[in-house]
Amino acid sequence: MSIFSHTFHTLSGESVALSQFQGQALLLFNSASQCGFTPQLTQFESIHEQYACQGLQIIGFPCNQFKNQEPGSNANIATFCTKNHGVSFLMSEKIEVNGPHAHPLWQELKSTKRGFLGTSAIKWNFTKFLIAPNGEVVLRAAPFTQPIKLIADIERVLHK
């Protein structure tokens, strides 16, 4: 299955097919509003502003599976992200990234690009995946990896 064959719903409930982004690079991550890594949202927005016109789509996937750090409704999440971090990139509705109810996209991401020591499970909020325009999952970055540290990888994928 291709990364671009998946769909998701935005925080407002709109269905989005990743196929519309085929030929563009994707930077996907799971998020939470009450996490120590939440300030990364501001960096993601800065990267979005700089690289969206070059073919990069950033999509955040709120998740409440790690210490209940995303307890709010989809509407609350949208307000928080916009008000506190100026988020204008796509954000999905709240999903699960691990377990039997994990979103199919995240199941594929985890099986395609394993984490530290070969584990597939997402260990914490703000795990990042960079996908090339051809659908190849290029890298998986740990939660503590600042988004700005991925710029060289993003540029390499965009200019292949």
Residue ranges and their predicted role:
Residues 1-160:
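Chalcogenol-based redox active-site neighborhoods
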